[in-house]
């Protein structure tokens, strides 16, 4: 036992629950006069927990746990309760006792206690915790309120967050970005739809229910127009009351009337302001193409069904527009000039 008085550097005294009970405590009870330098005898109920480090420290560097023997006494001579009061507070048991086994045989029990500053029943909970080990052979038997116990005292670890670690901050931002894929909310008379983007969340603003329905009801669109923000160029698409498509690309202003007869289609305004909502030219091409095709279909419905030449012209024009739109969608990007020339040719 004396050889353990000085622990060489690099070694730490960190016994298991089984070793504390089955070896150290059992020998202490069998030989009360035996002294173990690594575990000192301390009257726990006459000192404060913050004094344990000085009394039980082993001087081997930084320590987080302190071990000591203590003799339990009854609070009242004729009672059964253990006296766990100190000068400035008290130790309060918490939870259920844990059984300690050695080779599948019960050798002791472990009780967990928390130190409270002040007097019972009112006290301020501290971060000092103690495990009190006692010899026990019957798990369901009454606890022994007197005799030697071995204790491990330590301070509760505080959970901290590393704000410099990007992984700890990724959860909240990822959760917020995921909402852009599914979130939809109504603001006033207009609807705002949040669409996915590879680089950053971008918002499409529709100011009327007609334009929104034509964009999102793909089953009613014969060409299945799908909004996409891949390779998006910073632009803004909004509603225009007079039924015009207006695009502002740096120094160029392009305007096209999409109204046919008494029926006005939804217009779009494209602004190169990076702070506004954005969409790409490819999406604009698809949208305008679908609007032109749908307007021509409605014209043919209102015309005389006997006019076969008009029907043939319409179908021929629709096929040409579909081929043009497919070829334009196959390209990686569309410039404002190509979009303007294509829109004029298809509308005339």
UniProtKB/Swiss-Prot annotation:
One Gene Ontology CC term in the entry: secondary cell wall
DNA-binding region: 107-162
Keyword Hydrolase among record annotations: no
UniProt cross-references to InterPro entries, sorted A to Z: NAC-dom (IPR003441), NAC_dom_sf (IPR036093)
Highest rank taxon of the organism: Eukaryota
Bias kind Low complexity: ranges: 327-341
Residues covered by region (Disordered): 325-348
Key words of the record: Activator, Cell wall biogenesis/degradation, Developmental protein, DNA-binding, Nucleus, Transcription, Transcription regulation
Domain NAC: 7-156
Induction of the gene: By brassinosteroids (e.g. brassinolide BL), auxin (e.g. 2,4-dichlorphenoxyacetic acid 2,4-D) and cytokinin (e.g. kinetin), with a synergistic effect. Accumulates during infection by the soilborne fungal pathogen Verticillium longisporum, especially in tissues undergoing de novo xylem formation.
Biological role: Transcription activator that binds to the secondary wall NAC binding element (SNBE), 5'-(T/A)NN(C/T)(T/C/G)TNNNNNNNA(A/C)GN(A/C/T)(A/T)-3', and to the tracheary elements (TE) specific regulating cis-element (TERE), 5'-CTTNAAAGCNA-3', in the promoter of target genes (e.g. genes involved in secondary wall biosynthesis, cell wall modification such as xylan accumulation, and programmed cell death).
Protein name in UniProt: NAC domain-containing protein 101
